[in-house]
Amino acid sequence: MMNELFGEFLGTLILILLGNGVVAGVVLPKTKSNSSGWIVITMGWGIAVAVAVFVSGKLSPAYLNPAVTIGVALKGGLPWASVLPYILAQFAGAMLGQILVWLQFKPHYEAEENAGNILATFSTGPAIKDTVSNLISEILGTFVLVLTIFALGLYDFQAGIGTFAVGTLIVGIGLSLGGTTGYALNPARDLGPRIMHSILPIPNKGDGDWSYAWIPVVGPVIGAALAVLVFSLF
């Protein structure tokens, strides 16, 4: 069990370090990759997911996502007694990963005066704030993610191909569905760094948009549950 928890912790740490690292590189001032755009962010997140799964896959199932963890438990693939420890490990990894992003880009954070840009390197936010639409966006994106992960399990792949497919899937979801909310798809990916945004001493950071914070938590869990329901028909 400890190996599995360490795998979930380490994998989620790598996920946030690389994923929010690319966001910081695109958004924060005076970086080499500043203003390189949404396609770079989606590609970066796809690579981040693939690398994180490769790193942690020998230690744990590499769920790295509370919504996926709950979905697997609903499907009967994980004992419910393991769900909370997995989620806690994922949140711990996400929070430490975000601290490393902050350390990596500290001079650039200090040069940034726009509070919205700073928050964007920690957590997601909607392009247009609309509670119902934003919630649907997170539900749909996570539904596609979890259903596809389950479907991939029906096929025999050579080692690593499934992981590459999931990374590609993240890019696809980001390009197709992610432009509305920034596609959290993962409660730990959003809430863990959002908590660190409130804690870390960053000039001009503003607030953490906590009125929105429930959507990237609840939406992915609903999406994962719907994916379990649909997959039961396969």
From Swiss-Prot:
Q: Would you indicate the residue range of the signal peptide? A: none
Write down what this protein is called: Glycerol uptake facilitator protein
| Domain remarks in the Swiss-Prot or TrEMBL record | Aquaporins contain two tandem repeats each containing three membrane-spanning domains and a pore-forming loop with the signature motif Asn-Pro-Ala (NPA).
The alphabetical list of record keywords is: Cell membrane, Membrane, Repeat, Transmembrane, Transmembrane helix, Transport
Motif interval(s): NPA 2 = 186-188
* Location(s) in or outside the cell: Cell membrane
Family listed? Belongs to the MIP/aquaporin (TC 1.A.8) family.
Catalytically driven reaction(s): glycerol(in) = glycerol(out)
Query: Which positions does the motif NPA 1 occupy?
Result: 65-67
Q: What does this protein do?
A: Mediates glycerol diffusion across the cytoplasmic membrane via a pore-type mechanism.
Q: Name one Pfam family in it.
A: MIP
Asked if the record carries the keyword Electron transport, the reply is no
Q: Which domain of life is it from?
A: Bacteria
Keyword Transmembrane helix assigned to the entry: answer is yes
Q: Which residues form a coiled coil?
A: none
Listed GO molecular functions?
A: glycerol channel activity
CC terms in the record's Gene Ontology section: plasma membrane
Stretches that traverse the bilayer:
9-29, 37-57, 61-81, 83-103, 135-155, 159-179, 214-234
Q: How does it sit in the membrane?
A: Multi-pass membrane protein
